[in-house]
Each structure stands twice: as C-alpha cells, then as structure tokens.
C-alpha cells in the first residue's frame, strides 16, 4: 500500500476529522501516543487538507522526521542545531548557515503548501550558558546593602564592564 492510499484512508477516518476540527479552534495540536510514522501520516493529512506548511519540533529525532517526510512527498528542510557548548565560540559552518538562511528566506517568501521543516528544540533555543556558569558570572545586589565603590568597580570589571 502506498502512502497516498494510506493518506486517503486516514482522510476518511473519524479521528482525522476530530483532529482537524480541533486544529481549527486550537491553532496547534500535540499528538501523543502514536508512533513517529502515525504522527507523520496524521500531520501530513491535516497540512495537505489545509494547504499549509508543516513544522515538526522534536527533542532529538529531526533527521529521522526529515527522511520520513521526504518519503511522503514533502519538500523538507532540516533546521540543524549548532553543536557547541556554552562560552565556546559559535563558529557555524557555511553549509549549516546557508541551510538556515535558505529556510528563513523561503518562509519569508510565499510558503509552499508542501514545505516541511524538521528541527529540534535545541536548534530553536539561543546559545545560553548553564545555570552554574551564569551564576558564577553574575553580581547580585540587594536593596539596603552597602559596598565600597572600589569593590563594586572591581566586581563590575571582572564581569566585563568598562569604566567610561
């Protein structure tokens, strides 16, 4: 059975109708309890029914999602995360930068109905330091506390502030 035949069967199912009605009012849905293939089939049906692009945000499986969606005739972009650690220079390679720019440019232009983007949560988050590193490089001031100007100036200089 081809994916087209499976999608036609899904289109006739009551669950697809119920999810489609919920999507009209909720604007987004969270599918749980299905396999990746099941979620992909339902998502494909709903997006094709509404002629809308598809965005898949997952914890780690963006590449697998991209491959699955390609087999379902989507034009898929993989929005990859940067593999860097906090306080490491975020040197982005040209291929990743070009792919991200291409995805964003396509979204700014008129989006095509068969456009799908697969990404991870990490790729969408800004490059942030860990909580411990952030606290180590922070200065906490409380109302009513007093400090000498020299100590305050040296603490601010240690944090990277420059006297003007």
Model-identified regions with their sequence ranges:
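ASCE RecA-like P-loop NTPase motor cores
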Residues: 1-164
């Amino acid at each position: 059975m081809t994916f087209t035949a499976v999608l036609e069967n899904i289109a006739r199912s009551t669950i697809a109708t119920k999810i489609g009605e919920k999507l009209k009012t909720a604007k987004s849905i969270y599918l749980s309890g299905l396999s990746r293939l099941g979620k992909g089939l339902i998502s494909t049906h709903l997006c094709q029914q509404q002629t809308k692009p598809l965005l898949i945000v997952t914890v780690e499986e963006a590449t697998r999602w991209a491959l699955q969606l390609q087999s379902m005739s989507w034009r898929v972009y993989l929005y990859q995360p940067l593999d860097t650690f906090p306080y490491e220079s975020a040197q982005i390679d040209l291929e990743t930068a070009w792919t991200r720019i291409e995805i964003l440019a396509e979204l700014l232009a008129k989006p095509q109905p068969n456009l799908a983007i697969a990404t991870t949560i990490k790729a969408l988050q800004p490059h942030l330091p860990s909580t411990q590193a952030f606290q180590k490089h922070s200065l906490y001031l409380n109302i009513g506390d007093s400090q000498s100007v020299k100590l305050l100036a040296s603490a601010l200089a240690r944090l990277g502030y420059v006297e003007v």
